[in-house]
Amino acid sequence: MTDKPGSAEDTIEMDDTCSPQFVQEVNRIKSQIKSLVEENHTRKFFRPLTSNIGDETAILRIQFNNMMSKMEEKEKQSLVKELIKMVHHVAEKNSPDRVFVGTNYERVVDQLLRYAHQKGAISTNLCAEGLIMTSDFRLCSRICQEKWKFINDCIPKIDYKGIRNILRYILESQLRRLPYSLSPEQVNEIRIVENVILHIVDRDSNLMPPLITLSEIMRGMPKQALMLPRLTEKLASLSVHFRPIADLSHVCGRGFVYPIPLHPSFYPLTSCWEEHGLNASNTIVQPHHTLPYRPEHTSTYLYTLYMILRQPLGKDSLHPPSKTKTKTNWEMLISVMICESMAEAESLPETEPIPRYQWDNIVNIVIYGITQHLLVPKTFFNVLKNLIKRCKYTRARDEVMWIVFQVVGSLSNLTRLDDAVTEIVELYNELFDGDVVWMGASDHPALFARFLAAAGTWMILEKDFADKMPPANETIKSHIKFIQDGVDNFDSSNTAMLAVLSNIYRTDTKMGKLIVPTLQQMLESIDDTKSLFELSYKRMAVNCFSAFPVEFMEALTFRSKKTLLIQCFQPLRSFSTVRLPSPAVFETVAKICESEDYEMAVKDMEHLAQRSLHVATAADRSSGEHQNVQAKDQCYFLFDFLVYRLPHLHAYSKYSSTVNALSYFTQHIPNNPQNHQIYRLMEQFLMRRWCWAGFHGCITAHTQMFGTSYKDNTMMRHMAYPKTFSVPDQYPFAINPEIFKMAIYSFLRAVKITAQDIAIEKTMFPTIINGFGWPEKSTSYFPKWALDAIKASDTSNAVNTEEILSDVRNTARMHTSLTPNQFVIRYGEDRDPATSHCMLAVLFHFAYNSVDSTYNITSEFYEVMEKKTPKEIVVMGNYLVDYIIADAKTQDCNEKTFKNIAKAAALLVFQFQVLRADRLLLSLIMHPATDEDALICIQIANEFILTPEFQERIRWYHQNVPKKDHFPTEYIKAIVKYHDAFPEFEACELVRSYDSSSNVHMPTYYGCLIERLLPIMDQYLHVALEQQGYKLNPQILQSVSMLYKFHAMPIHFMYSVLFTSHGLMSGPDAKSFVLAFATQIEECHLTEAFEKFNHQKSSREQLIMELIDRMSASLDFILTPPPFVAKDWKIAELSPGAQTLYLACIELMASPHSPETLVAAMINVMQMKPHARPFNIVNLTALLLTALPAAYSNALHDEFVAVFVNGETANLKFEEIVFDNYEESLLLNLPNRARTINVISQQYWLHCSLSLLNFFSHEYVPRILEHVKTEKDLWYTLRLVMPYLRRYYENWDTAKQMRSQRENFGPLHIVKLVFQKLGSMAEEGVEIVYEQHLCDLFYNCKYFFAGDFLRNTAITEFAKLPEKMRDRLKFYVSQSEPTAEQETPPEKEKSPEKEKEQEQEQHVKAHQPLESTPSVSSLPQMQHHLQQAPLLPSHQMMPPPQQHSSSLQHHLQHHTSTHQMMDTSQHQTIQQQSNHPTQQQLQHQIPNMSMHQQMGPQYPGAVFHHPSGPVGHVPMQYGMGHHMQQHPHLPHHQQMPAPMHTMNPMMQNMTPQQQYLYMQQLQQHQQHQQYMQQQQQHHHQHQQQPH
């Protein structure tokens, strides 16, 4: 039964843009087709005999053509799609009758389409697409061979976008419909289709860029295409052909590349290092797109992520707090880490305990992953179970269950566990599937807790998910019973059972309510019979030093530690001034903070300290003289703990804590002894926050506060005026300028070391640089913007030395003429700017003048000092330094003078105690603004350090005070003894009338003078080296180095000193410097070759190999780190890999060997012997080079250039240069030095900072290309350059700059240089052998990032290339998209019926390149077409009329006179009109539109196919076709037609000549009407023009 016309299945469904008339017309034509096929009486009677229905479509063809001629392009496409749907709808009915009917539908629709194409109503492209889609690829009916021959003939006449769409239709839409088994007859039948595909994909056909062909093939080829043997073979060879370009676009050995967390070039806060799949594409993870490549390059780089993740502290690099976190392959990676650790534990002797270094790291990673929603427990436990199932381990099963117990017991409120219960039970069954020997010891809490972790997990799951838990086995039951017995017989002295119960029972349970007071009691327990312990300066605290053993702390889960931390806060809040919190409380908090991430512990402690600071300052304002001493005590001991006990954290520089500390300094601080001490402590807090962070942390801290995102608030306005600190005005500077200046030095050193680009526009950086004076020698490593800011600084506020000397001497004389009371009134409350800050200078004047005699200070001086605020004390110290400099310049500056000055200063500091030693040294180091003043102050500081008083304190501290990380109890007791031996008094204590019954000293647990000196000594050594020619007095070096036994970041310090002074400090001095500090630093393990033999005993290659082996060992260990790294990662300065990297760099920078010889040795290492993991050595070598100063990378660049100079590329094959087979050649013992240089250079640029890519593109690549002489040289350069173009472009800020600077920036500049070099090589006659690969490479660049930015350069340079290569590149120089102002009609379409005429036309063009004359036979069609075209109002056809010029009037007169001869000499007229195309016409065309363009996405960076220009054109016209001819006299903007969607539909399918003729007639009609209205007599003869 057939469906009636107009039934529901035939009703067209169009979008809102289609008019009702259009829908009606489409339904009508469909009904006519259906009527023609379904109700044909001939078929009814003669179907068994024939399928020929005769030529009954003639009328329908004419109707169809007329209808199509009136449609816009979009409507034509919609109509063709509807016809295709109708054919497929009928053909899909599988009855024999319907198959026959479907075949007739296909024939009718095909005839309609071909007739419309023949008459010019539809484009060749649309016709071919429709014919393809009407074919029945289910093979229920036969494939029309003649139709597919027609399609094959049409292909060369279609632009490449249309050909791409045709290929898409065949592959994605039609071949997928083929059955999976074909008979030989069917294979023979579709061979014509195979021929069409082969014709399209054949590289020699050059129908479209081969890269687009490959893209379509790889994206859309169905499995059915593999049944066609010739096609399969062709596609395989096509993919193989692109292998060189695919390899070239990746770094050699990319699958084995990994960074080291905390590396100077490893900047985690940018998207550049985020692993693929963690929110942003990583620049190291370069997208392969459509290029074929190895399997390891088509998936996430798990090895890179694995190597980052398994390093302690590495996880923090992957997910900065500011980034949104998404999960990725963490489940698999952590499961592998666990299984590796279990396997390693199996190899240990049975009696040897399992090292917990890496297990603690794994637990930390798991907790972090789940809290940040990077791990899904269900997936994680399932993956882990499946891995453990394959290999039975027995040693570390308790450690695995401890991880499970941590998740179940601590993180149930942060993640879903209900769907992971089954996986947990199955994981337990896999771990303990047989007879198990259980071992647990109550005298070892950590092992005991892990022994019962499985039972604890079961108890919690049974309570929370009773309906999902299976019955426990006998082992679990016995353990649960054992735990319940511990509950029934609770014994608080059994710490092991206490830890287990604390882990299992929450605080809201009955047992939990017993555990909390027990832990609180242990915190408050007393060690000896004495209940109180005397801290420094007779402050009393609870006498308890170790509340919980270390093993007990390791037996607690994350939740239990958090509970214990909250309990520790209780005594920190509730205490009295005579009974302060015990040291045990602080040590417990310290252990928890060290074992957990910042967000889990330290953050809470910082918030508590910040609140106490606000309370203390509020108490000052509210209570006046009756200040809240308890609030100040709490504030002081909390910051004392944060500053001195936790000096270095890897999440240290927090914006909020720094801002809160700065806010404290902007307030008015009352003058009392307690506030003086808090002020000094807060200065240390800021100093360490700013200066003791890692390099990237330091940069982040400063850019957050002063960078582009700085907040224009009151505090920032304070910070913008550093010179107002001593002279208050509208915005008084908040903090000691010397501290802030020291922070800027640290910031700029970090910028130098990391080579980061700092955005300066709309930041405060130039302002704060401008506010200080900078000795020139100390600015050697400053970036250009900082030097420019210094040059622009205002020097009008320079110190007036004469005025200072006069004021001090006058004040000294006034002392003798005033009574003590008058002196105190005169100078203690004086606000005269000339004399209010000079008192320390006056005291120094007296002390210096009596340096050889005994001088005692009188009480009135202390009374004056007592009346000074903390800020005034700072200003007085700077004033003292100004006076010392001014006074020293009046004398003979010799060694004796400096010793006397230092002796007088020591008298003020250590005997009179009117000034602190650290404040004096800070002013001496940071206050001078010129090199002359800085050198004087450094020499004074040198002598001050060598004074007996200073030396005595250093030696005592070094000999008697242990490291607080390892011996906290002994440290606190030693600090008390130190203050007993060397007390520091407040000014009020030294006044005669002081009441000794009140103790003004704040409770000090950890701080002292030596601790305060540590960050200052860092800057002292930098300045001393800079001002003294990078030489240090050995005695000073020995004295200062003793302090670094207690330094929190000694390796960072040594590295930064050697980096900024590289090339300035001699080899012996550098070695002495390093060894002096290394002997004091516990974790500084240098090689024996350096310490004993100064790198002179072994060869340089052996030295490099030893350093690389150490780095590899510190990165590849599984359970226990090597002996030359820190033993505990939780309190280490650096992770193991970063520690060995920094120490290796320190050795190399202090080595007597030059950078050139060391870099040559790094290259030679790869030639020495076969390496088991060659790319690992290359990667570590690149990591070394990126962490070393620029001299080493310059040496590598020189080696690269030397390859060209020495002609080494001539010995390399093309395959050796391009392909990533370097590892294979090394494993076959076939090393090549030139290839090694290239591979190391690739990985160097991969690891380097993004900011160096500017140097790479504008300086390095041009330098290399200057030496390129041969094709192999060019390929050798491209092997280095190509992998980094995408890395450069994917940085968003860089991409924005590229869009603004276009071809003069970044990767476009590099590609432009390559084009120019290739053009110059072609002019010099250099033979290009692998031209196809070069063309493919250029297309790859065009479509992936270059676009049309380089089109003009390409036109110029490609014109110099051989003809064959130009032809392959013709698509590159075609215009991708016409601009809005320069849109033009579509290019001339071709049809099979006009093939001969077009061949003649092409022949004429070849011999007359400046003419484009249509054939005579086409003129009648054109004339007929024009006569049928309806006239539309001018506003629908033309753009808004422009102002007419005299030339236009002349043209109109000329045209009207010429038009009279149109009927008799139309051919000549058209020829005249098309003689001279303009330049704009040559550069802008519009492609044929196809129905696929509204059905699918366009190819990235797609361009349109235009035939190359005829031979003989100038180079700038290379590759451009002349598809539109215009009158030579008409201005271009007057001739451009309206956009396609506003044009007359008839014009869309005309040739350019027809369009132009039609447009001329419309213009004449419009002008004719105007002339009629104006009644111009000389136009009367043209009133009856035919249209």
Swiss-Prot record:
Residues 1410-1426, 1463-1484 have a biased composition (Polar residues). One of its GO terms (cellular component) is mediator complex. Residues 1374-1484, 1567-1587 are annotated as: Disordered. Residues 1385-1404 have a biased composition (Basic and acidic residues). It comes from the Eukaryota. Residues 1430-1450, 1567-1576 have a biased composition (Low complexity). It holds the Pfam family Med23. Belongs to the Mediator complex subunit 23 family. This is Mediator of RNA polymerase II transcription subunit 23. It comes from Caenorhabditis elegans.
